[in-house]
């Protein structure tokens, strides 16, 4: 579990105030949720990124708010790709004994046998819905694919996961599959098309015949 300090924002904030906060390297944020009133705060952007890299997108953070330390998760955040800047964060105060359902990323491990034979690994599901208490939410789910041949697939029911959590997706939902390689036209088909093009008469240029007759 990681810690992050915040500074309470006082009064009503105008757009120019929020811009000034961002230009100073801070991110405007709001904290709300279990047993807490809505509080407007700001946090250091660099420190926030460090914390997320440490605990993951669904990790629990000890957020310092005034004289209190509150356990929170990141409910949402906005990012401006043009400025490469986090523009706002929603912190959700949580009850550590209460289960939550969140999206957890799927990480494929290994190289499929079928991929070595020319097949293509297709991953329909990049995230899975997981229900658990905050401390039991995994940062990601690893799926071993080394033994998959062309035509093989793994569904949610096939996953070998450990931990005190429940995957909410349908058991038959496909997580990953190895599909046959896409085949281009054969040499015979290419030759047939080229022969057809050669037999096609060139279009007559309008006015050419009349000029010859003159």
UniProtKB/Swiss-Prot annotation:
It holds the Pfam family Ribosomal_TL5_C. GO terms for cellular component: cytosolic large ribosomal subunit. The keyword Magnesium does not apply. InterPro entries: Rbsml_bL25/Gln-tRNA_synth_N, Ribosomal_bL25/Gln-tRNA_synth, Ribosomal_bL25_b-dom, Ribosomal_bL25_C, Ribosomal_bL25_long, Ribosomal_L25_dom, Ribosomal_uL5_bac-type. CDD domains: Ribosomal_L25_TL5_CTC. Keywords: Ribonucleoprotein, Ribosomal protein, RNA-binding, rRNA-binding. GO terms for biological process: translation. Residues 179-214 are annotated as: Disordered. Transmembrane segments: none annotated. Residues 188-202 have a biased composition (Acidic residues). One of its GO terms (molecular function) is 5S rRNA binding. Part of the 50S ribosomal subunit; part of the 5S rRNA/L5/L18/L25 subcomplex. Contacts the 5S rRNA. Binds to the 5S rRNA independently of L5 and L18. Belongs to the bacterial ribosomal protein bL25 family. CTC subfamily. PANTHER family: RIBOSOMAL PROTEIN L25/GLN-TRNA SYNTHETASE, ANTI-CODON-BINDING DOMAIN-CONTAINING PROTEIN, RIBOSOMAL PROTEIN L25_GLN-TRNA SYNTHETASE, ANTI-CODON-BINDING DOMAIN-CONTAINING PROTEIN. This is one of the proteins that binds to the 5S RNA in the ribosome where it forms part of the central protuberance. This is Large ribosomal subunit protein bL25. It comes from Staphylococcus carnosus (strain TM300). The gene is rplY.
């Amino acid at each position: 579990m990681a810690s992050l300090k915040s500074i309470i924002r006082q009064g009503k904030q105008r757009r120019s105030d929020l811009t000034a906060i961002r230009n100073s390297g801070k991110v405007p944020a709001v904290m709300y949720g279990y047993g807490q009133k809505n509080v407007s705060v700001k946090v250091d952007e660099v420190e926030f990124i460090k914390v997320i890299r440490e605990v993951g997108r669904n990790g629990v953070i000890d957020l310092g708010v005034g004289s209190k330390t509150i356990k929170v998760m990141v409910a949402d955040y906005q990012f401006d790709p043009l400025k490469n800047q986090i523009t706002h964060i929603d912190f959700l105060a949580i009850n550590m004994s209460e289960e939550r359902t969140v999206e957890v990323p799927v990480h494929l491990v290994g190289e499929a046998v079928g991929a070595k034979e020319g097949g293509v690994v297709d991953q329909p599901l990049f995230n899975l819905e997981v229900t658990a208490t905050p401390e039991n939410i995994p940062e990601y789910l690893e799926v071993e694919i080394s033994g998959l041949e062309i035509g093989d697939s793994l569904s949610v029911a096939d996953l070998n996961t450990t931990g005190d959590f429940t995957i909410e997706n349908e058991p038959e939902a496909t997580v990953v599959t190895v599909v046959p390689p896409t085949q281009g036209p054969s040499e015979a088909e290419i030759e047939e098309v080229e022969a057809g093009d050669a037999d096609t008469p060139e279009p007559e240029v309008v006015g050419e015949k009349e000029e010859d007759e003159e």
